[in-house]
Amino acid sequence: MITDRQLSILNAIVEDYVDFGQPVGSKTLIERHNLNVSPATIRNEMKQLEDLNYIEKTHSSSGRSPSQLGFRYYVNRLLEQTSHQKTNKLRRLNQLLVENQYDVSSALTYFADELSNISQYTTLVVHPNHKQDIINNVHLIRANPNLVIMVIVFSSGHVEHVHLASDIPFNNDKLNTISNFVTNKLTEFNQNLQDDIVSFVQSEQEEIFINKLLNTMNNHISNQSNSIYMGGKVKLIDALNESNVSSIQPILQYIESNRIAELLQDISSPNINVKIGNEIDDSLSDISIVTSQYHFDETLKGQIAVIGPTAMHYQNVIQLLNRIW
């Protein structure tokens, strides 16, 4: 345990280091934070914090910077404080869903970009898993001679648009008939479905088209459940360029691999979680990931992540994720 005064000093060091990117000295602390104690007392308390591994000294400066343990202690206190706060939700994600005519993919793309612009960090938003949702309707629209747009409407009200390449010249009436057949058979994905298709179709072309439609729909829903929308990728590169150029490549490889997807999909708690440096991966000592869960309703849920340097404005990001969706 650390004393209240040591906690105040640690908080001040973390916040100054995040704001200015420079190690913090005792004189600077007194000037910026109006600490009503002598420089000698501050230096003594900083020595205690250093012995506890909460702050560390760099060779090029007389100041101190937070260690990973120091950031961890600071963040834990923040999370403890915010867990007791009631916040008014902005419901921005639901607004975007309406604005994009309930197209989930479009809404999440805009949401990732907005989060990045507000937080000034790179953001990831994971598409919700539709396994708990039910397909209510399938509509087919002829876009051009070689393209049919399949509109999938879920029981939650959300919509997915799927492009289906087809040069079979079905008119709109035939497409409506096929749409109604597929919609009626959605609850019968079993061994009898193929027999029903054979009985329903009037040509081999129709049978080929319906089987292609069903396969495309299943593949799309499966793939979308693993989709990740990224906003502000360049922001992470810019932030790391300022501190450690050599760390950029492994971080980008991690984000673009299945490992980040696995990390985010393991989030089952609605609470905000923060992983710092090596807590994420041994090769990622320079970044932090703040994660949370969002939901459109009780069944349709996904994950949000904000990624930045370990010297992140944690308080701003935590408050944002508490309110935005």
From Swiss-Prot:
The keyword Protein biosynthesis does not apply. One of its GO terms (molecular function) is DNA binding. It holds the Pfam family HrcA. It comes from the Bacteria. Keywords: Repressor, Stress response, Transcription, Transcription regulation. InterPro entries: GAF-like_dom_sf, HrcA, HrcA_C, WH-like_DNA-bd_sf, WH_DNA-bd_sf, WHTH_transcript_rep_HrcA_IDD. GO terms for biological process: negative regulation of DNA-templated transcription. Belongs to the HrcA family. PANTHER family: HEAT-INDUCIBLE TRANSCRIPTION REPRESSOR HRCA. Negative regulator of class I heat shock genes (grpE-dnaK-dnaJ and groELS operons). Prevents heat-shock induction of these operons. This is Heat-inducible transcription repressor HrcA.
